Amino acid sequence: MFSHLNQNTSGRHNSMDLNNSSISNFGTPVEQSTPALLFGKRKATVPSSYTASPLNTASAPCSDIFAVSAPAVPQHLKDTPGSKSVHWSPSLVQSGEKSAAQTQNTPANLSFGGNSSFSAPTKPAPQSIQTSSFGGQAMHAPPLRSLRDKVEPAKKISRRNTFTARSTPLSTPITQRVTSRLAEAEEQPMEEEADAADTWVTVFGFQPSQVSILLNLFSRHGEVVSHQTPSKGNFIHMRYSCVTHAQQAISRNGTLLDQDTFIGVVQCTNKDVINGSASGIVARSSNIAAAANRSASMYNSFVENDMADQSVNHNENSVLNSSNVFDANNSLNSSRISVRSGVGMRPLAADQRTNILQGTPSVRKAPDGLLNKFWNTIGLN
């Protein structure tokens, strides 16, 4: 009975040792096992009963308690380090020429050391298919756009191209001129209203008898187009031809008209006067005509003075040519620079010219030397 019990106990121990060895070796790669050469002759001390056991085969998990036999390992698995190695099927490594249905059924071999391995279905690797700009597939084709180009949907691009194609014939110089004139016509009324409000000024603080003096004074700043004087009051509304003249008139605010009157100038705020609907607005057309006549008379006076100067110069030249007066300017060589060309230089014959123009002949002064007195005494001089 005891022998039977010992056999059962030894069998249990052997099974436990087998399980422990299989568990300890499960998931351990061959490369990380302890080599036998580090333990010297311990391998020879192993009992023959253990080495002769049926577990000491090539399919066993281990052939020694200290060393693990090297099973046949494929060549593509020898370069995968780590405690757990995952090997993908070679069909996945190949170029993506197979269909997606074949790649979905490709198993993946997972090896955890030794012979314990299983296969599991894997998902297909995403294939990189290059799409051309025309919507088709371009396999192994060069890129058709730069990385900096803005990618837009095809519908948006076609819509934009259609819009530009339709709008291109309209962008002609004639249409541009028409649109610019329309824009100017729309802006002109608003600008005229703003200008009309800015060109009106109101002057106050004077006596009714000083209206003419006031108009003459403020006409110096610019052209007064019209004015409006109320029947009762000490103010007057005046309109200038431009905003700049009105601003200059407003700058005269608080000035002294005479010894007893201070005047003030502000911008006009009466809407009836600005719109031109107020009564008593007098247009100063007579002043405009007078100003035009004054400018014409000034122009005529300038022309007459210029013609008079030209006639004086002509007479002067004729007198100089007819007389025997020595002209230093005419005696010079024509190739040289004339004395008259010098700016600010007085000509040499200036005294002779002034004498001729004044009508007094030039008289030579007799020298006061001793020889000249002798000649005068003899009468030769």
Swiss-Prot record:
Coiled coil: none annotated. The keyword Transport applies. Disruption phenotype: RNAi-mediated knockdown results in embryonic lethality. Reduces nuclear import and diameter of pronuclei prior to pseudocleavage regression. Embryos show an abnormal distribution of nuclear pore complexes and patchy nuclear envelope assembly. Also causes severe defects in mitosis due to abnormal chromosome organization on the mitotic spindle during anaphase. Two-cell embryos appear to lack nuclei and pronuclei. It comes from the Eukaryota. Keywords: Cell cycle, Cell division, Membrane, Mitosis, mRNA transport, Nuclear pore complex, Nucleus, Protein transport, Translocation, Transport. Residues 82-135 have a biased composition (Polar residues). The keyword Membrane applies. Its main location: nucleus. GO terms for biological process: cell division; embryo development ending in birth or egg hatching; mRNA transport; NLS-bearing protein import into nucleus; nuclear pore organization; nucleus organization; regulation of exit from mitosis. Transmembrane segments: none annotated. GO terms for molecular function: nucleic acid binding; phospholipid binding; structural constituent of nuclear pore. GO terms for cellular component: nuclear envelope; nuclear membrane; nuclear pore; nuclear pore central transport channel; nuclear pore nuclear basket. It is found in: Nucleus, Nuclear pore complex; Nucleus membrane. Residues 195-275 form the RRM Nup35-type domain. Residues 1-26, 77-149 are annotated as: Disordered. Pfam families: RRM_Nup35. Belongs to the Nup35 family. Functions as a component of the nuclear pore complex (NPC). NPC components, collectively referred to as nucleoporins (NUPs), can play the role of both NPC structural components and of docking or interaction partners for transiently associated nuclear transport factors. Thereby required for nuclear import. Required for the proper organization of chromosomes on the mitotic spindle during anaphase. This is Nucleoporin NUP35. The gene is npp-19.
